[in-house]
Amino acid sequence: SGSIHRNVLDELAPRFIVQGVSEAELAVNLYAEMLRRGSHGVARFNLPLGEDVVGLASFGKSGLVKTAFDGPGGTGGTCVAVQSIGSAFRKLQAGRLVYLDIPCGVDGYHTDKTVVYYYGDLDQDPFSDKIRSAYEHCVFLEELTASLLQPGMVIENIYRQVMEQFDPQYENGFMNGGKFLGHSIG
């Protein structure tokens, strides 16, 4: 499952991130690539009725829309009643962040992977410094979290230690407002 995730979201996704693709089309295309490589097509996690199929793709501010799901980002979806997959009408334009949160599973083992791409020439973006700074802070937090994941560690203590290093300028959109660093897939 992890190998499929790496292949599809790290290696193939950039080929599908093209001008004019819709959020929904991108999510479904990547989901289909996972199925072609052996994903069983459903991911389960530790919530009541906790199943996900396609996951979601979001462009720009759509990724900051809060949903009922406890993921690190969100989507406006097609409408407020369908906040999943992504919008079939929101098309990718240059200068947008592309947020992908698409689960994968093989033989009952589930992995979860979220990636963010920038579509366009980041050097030409007037917010390039802010985007790079936010990226560097996220990498710092991820590396710190990974370094603390040791046998016997209490997850709540890891969360507290990481959040002590958190830059409050990002709190408005961090983990879509949730108080977690990950959730129960994998």
Describe the function of each predicted region.
Residues 1-186:
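Active-site neighborhoods and metal-handling regions in enzymes and metal-associated proteins
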